[in-house]
Amino acid sequence: MAGALFDAAGRVLITQRPPGKALAGRWEFPGGKLHEGEDAFAGLVRELGEELDVEVRSGERLLRYSHAYPERVVWLDMWIVSAWSGEPRGLEGQALKWVELPALPTEDILEADRPIIEALLSLDLGHGNTTGP
C-alpha cells in the first residue's frame, strides 16, 4: 500500500528508492507491504510511521490495482492521507521531494506507480483537503 501526503501548498510527497534496493534512484509514493493479517489502513499507518516518522490519522482509499513485474504480480492499495502530523523525513535512507501535481508525469516514478499519477491528476483535490504541515 502507499499514501499520498499533501503539504499546505498542495504538493504531494514522493520518495526516492535508496542505493542497494531494487530500482534504486527511482521515485515512488511512500508505503510498503502489509504484515500477515494486517488491514490496508493499519499497514499504511505503520509504514508511513516507519518510513517517514509521520502519524497518519485518517485517509481514504483512492484505488486498488495490480501491477505485473517479470517475476510476480502485486496488488497495490493507494490512499489519500487526509489527516497527518509530523515532519516527514527519510528514516530508511530515502530522499524526499514535494512535487506539484502537474509535474508528477515528468518525474522518474516507478511504472507500478503510474496509475496513481493518473488517478491523482483526475481528482479535484483543491487546497486544504488534507491536513499536515
Label each PLM-derived region with a short phrase:
Residues 7, 55-56, 64-89, 95-97, ...:
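Active-site-adjacent beta-strand/loop module that shapes the phosphate/pyrophosphate-binding cleft
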Residues 1-12, 33:
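Conserved N-terminal beta-strand and adjoining loop/helix that marks the start
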Residues 86, 101-115:
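C-terminal structural segments of small proteins and small subunits
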Residues 112-133:
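Charged phosphate-binding loop/patch that engages nucleotide di/tri-phosphates or the phosphate backbone
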Residues 22-25, 98:
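A conserved beta-turn-beta hairpin within the catalytic core of GNAT-like acetyltransferases
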Residues 29-61, 100:
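The catalytic Nudix box helix
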Residues 17-20, 54, 109:
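Short coil/turn segments
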